[in-house]
Amino acid sequence: MNTNKILQADLEAYSLDETKIADVIVDSDMSYEEAVLNGLPKGCPEEILSKQVILEVYYLSFDGKIHKGQIVVDERVAKEVQEVFTVAFETKFQITSVIPISKFGWDDDKSMDVDNTSAFNYRTIANTDILSRHSRGWAVDINPRLNPHYRKDGEIVPPGGIYEAGKPGVLVEGDAIVKTFKKYCWGWGGNWIGEKDWQHFEKEEV
């Protein structure tokens, strides 16, 4: 078991003590093998795979309770992503779930359909042969049903997703999460011209 590939959350950063931890709802507690290796799509280079780590994160979910989840990212952006989640927690930004996409058979549609937040997924950009930033663990999608992708052709992904700024769990320009990502030079799909992908943050290079 690659326990060194699982980065535990700093409880002090989340202002959590043993009393609060006892009441936390665990959404994901996967091993590295389960989260990263199980069913991994063919063709993922070792150069990419070797850099993936599991971050343990805490978040306020829509039941009003604290949950613990996991997200797989490139180790070189791990501190930045962990800071995003601590900021989300501090500002009481609600997140539905944070579970590695392997739980959904590496199927992005299935993960988005239940509004799951995820990162690493060795796949191409939809309708292209180009590898997504998710393939390197350099992209994060947050609450995809609440922050859907409005494509140029008018398609909304995931189907049924509705973007309503001001509602809980919805990302908007200037909020703490967007600011934190931008502080570390991540791009946000909410700033794209011609189409919007409000769920999506990506890093060009690390």
Predicted regions and their residues:
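Catalytic cores and adjacent binding grooves of peptidoglycan-active enzymes
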Residues: 124-131, 136-206
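Generic structural hydrophobic/aromatic packing signal, biased to beta-strands
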Residues: 54-57, 84, 88, 120, ...
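N-terminal post-signal-peptidase region of extra-cytosolic proteins
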Residues: 36-43, 68-74, 124-126
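Active-site-adjacent loop/helix surface patches within enzyme catalytic domains
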Residues: 94-136, 147-149
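A generic structural signal for short, non-catalytic loop/turn and secondary-structure boundary residues
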Residues: 47-52, 113-115, 133-135, 194
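Active-site acidic/histidine clusters and adjacent loop/turn architecture
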Residues: 47-111
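N-terminal module-boundary/linker segments of secreted carbohydrate-active enzymes
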Residues: 1-65
